[in-house]
Amino acid sequence: MLSDLMINRDFLAYTLANPNQLPAAYDFMLADHTRVDVWDTGVIVFTPANATKDIVLSCAVHGNETAPIEICNQLIKDLLSQRIIAKQRVMFLIGNPTAILNKTRFIDENMNRLFSGAHSKGEGLSHPERHRAKALEQYVADFFNANSDNQRIHYDLHTAIRASKHEKFAIYPYRPGRAFSGEQIMFLAACGVDTMLFHHEPTTTFSYYSSQQFQADAFTVELGKVMPFGQNDMSRFAQTHTMLEKLITETKLAPVEFDPSKVNLYKVSRSINKHFDDFEFSFAGDAENFSAFSQGEVLATEGGNAIIVEYPQEAIVFPNANVPIGQRTVLCLVPAPNESIL
């Protein structure tokens, strides 16, 4: 197994050759004295001595979001080849290998709705993606629980289904009683992620799980638009790759003071769920994320009723009418100039 991985140091290829599971977990040491643990298919941990941060970089929770997969695979390859040397402990997760092979967002169910125990509710552990979500939760728990003093960070990397007026943006999970981190917002801005959405309620996303369970600085990070493998312009992700490499390989990053002029800040005003099969948006199917609508405009109709804009202006992200009844169809946003940011 080790020889298979180290021949090309291509962890993605190794994962896709073993999409369901590995025969056994194993570990080895690099010449730079970094310990490498392969816990499962798509799960690899690098542990140097004297780390002060525990970092989770996850990708492919949706299998067709290829740019984050390519970014993570290159970082893993560079660590395995020792082109770069880890100074911080980092776990990479390739979330849904079978969906990658299928070239689809998911096989049976949207995995980013299955965390914080949602995998075992309703129909229970009824298909592989629910089992995988449960396993990923446990790997994150094992990783973070190994240290109590280190800073905990989780960037769950995605690309969006549709184009966006702000190409790169992040969702800051709901964290009652905890201020938002200006340092983290500025780090993401340096990654090219210049737009932040502050969520208003608990969710069942991967980033919320890490934030809520382990008080991690956790984010869902959207890096652009979904493209097939081989069609990503990786120059558009150069800032992200550079900053993630710095995060892993530097003992301490120079702090950057929060500057609201460098970022676009929104908060979620409401989440609109689907209640009837006839749910239909009133705007064009190719409307970009962050398209804005004025108070009184009709956003959608369902069950004979109109859903209208409630604020002077609301922007929308992640519109998707083709979800099961009870699930979210869209997030509505308003400007957030006064959030508690330290």
UniProtKB/Swiss-Prot annotation:
GO molecular function, one term: succinylglutamate desuccinylase activity
UniProt key word Metal-binding: yes
Summary of the function given for this chain in its UniProt record: Transforms N(2)-succinylglutamate into succinate and glutamate.
Catalytic activities: N-succinyl-L-glutamate + H2O = L-glutamate + succinate
Pfam families reported for this sequence: AstE_AspA_cat, AstE_AspA_hybrid
Top-rank taxon, per record: Bacteria
Family label: Belongs to the AspA/AstE family. Succinylglutamate desuccinylase subfamily.
Source organism of the structure: Shewanella frigidimarina (strain NCIMB 400)
Protein name: Succinylglutamate desuccinylase
Gene: astE
Known EC number: 3.5.1.96
